[in-house]
Design a protein with these regions (language model features):
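FIC/Doc superfamily catalytic core
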Residues: 1-355
Length: 355
């Protein structure tokens, strides 16, 4: 079963037949996905840890650049920054310093002990994984953390050239389990473990995972996530349970991503068809097509100058007309004014077509 799932992941992720999995999203808002997908993973990963913040509040915080209003929003902002950092370092070898940096990014201003961000737990700091009734895991003694984390980094960076081949998906999942098991930090270990799995997947060429949220699947059945972990411990370290659980979650995440892209592409195509017979000018249609392809992404007047090959004054006039039609909203960001497509842009265009 595991071998079949690994092959299925390769096919669905595009690695087996398309080395550049970004092609999957070329025609469906790649820029928007590049910004919003890390946020979706940040939200669901944080919600797994108890953050109550909603998707709409988190999206508003990231888009406007406002400061977090509570602990939940701080966790999400930290996760978002960590996901962006993972993309930056995907081609770098994993080091202890990078693990500590990720932990600091993920937990900054969220811990009961502020000084615990970015450092291993000390021998006098008791850590366990439990709910109100049951202790699921008591991590190994803190004295072994330095050695174990060095070993984990060596494992993560192993390219198999010495003959010790391991499927890349398996390696990423083992990294996830290993860090979770060792629990090297006072808190935030689950977030770091999932971050390392993403780093490993991206480093191995599974670039589609820059856009796929695995935590969104784990959040739907957190008890199964915990159960898969505890089964490994109670069965003499047999990782099969966790590998099967995680490969199933990855496949479901890929399926949901594919469905989302399909829905998005069809909706955009339908809306673009509406524009062809609309009362908007050619320049306005050009701008609206870009807005449809990149929902939630800022439109600057300089962008319109480029798309339509017009002067600044003409581009500004076009954007004001679209604003007056209720199709875009103007916001001030720093010293500049930018425009954002309204969230119900497609619905408004459909209504315009009926009139």
């Amino acid at each position: 079963m595991l071998i079949e799932r690994l092959h299925e992941i390769d096919v669905k992720a595009g690695v087996a037949v398309r080395p550049d999995a970004r092609r999957i999203v070329t025609d469906a808002s790649a820029e928007y996905l590049r910004d919003m997908s890390p946020l979706f993973e940040a939200v669901t990963s944080s919600q797994l840890e108890g953050a109550p913040t909603t998707w709409s509040d988190a999206k508003c915080m990231i888009r406007t650049g406002r400061k977090p209003r509570d602990l939940g929003e701080r966790m999400i902002l930290n996760n978002y920054k960590a996901m962006q950092r993972i993309v930056e370092i995907k081609d770098h070898p994993l080091t202890v310093d990078l693990i500590k940096e990720l932990h600091h990014t993920l937990t900054e201003d969220t811990l009961d002990k502020p000084d615990a961000a970015g450092r291993y737990r000390r021998e006098d700091e008791y850590v366990r994984v439990a709910d109100d009734e049951t202790v699921f895991h008591v991590p190994p003694h803190a004295s072994r953390m330095a050695v174990e984390m060095e070993a984990l980094c060596s494992f993560a960076n192993d390219d198999g050239k010495d003959g010790t081949y391991m499927p890349d998906i398996v390696r990423a999942i083992v990294l996830h389990f290993w860090l979770s098991y060792e629990h090297p930090f006072c808190d935030g270990n689950g977030r770091v473990a999932r971050a390392l799995m993403y780093w490993s997947l991206l480093r191995s060429g599974y670039s589609v995972f820059e856009f796929v949220s695995i935590s969104s699947i784990l959040k739907k059945a957190p008890s199964k996530y915990v159960r898969a972990f505890t089964y490994v411990e109670t069965d003499e370290g047999d990782l099969t349970y966790f590998l099967l659980h995680q490969t199933k979650a990855i496949l479901r995440a890929l399926d949901e991503f594919k469905d989302y892209i399909g829905r998005k592409a069809r909706k955009i195509q339908d809306a673009e068809s509406l524009l062809k017979g609309s009362r908007f000018s050619l320049r306005e249609r050009t701008i609206l097509v870009q807005a449809l392809r990149n929902p939630g992404y800022p439109i600057r007047i300089s962008d319109c100058e480029t798309w339509c090959a017009v002067s600044y004054a003409t581009a500004r006039s076009d954007m004001i007309k679209l604003q007056n039609h209720g199709l875009v909203e103007m916001r001030k960001e720093g010293n500049a004014f930018v425009y954002y497509p309204v969230s119900n842009l497609i619905d408004i265009l459909e209504e315009c077509r009926k009139k």
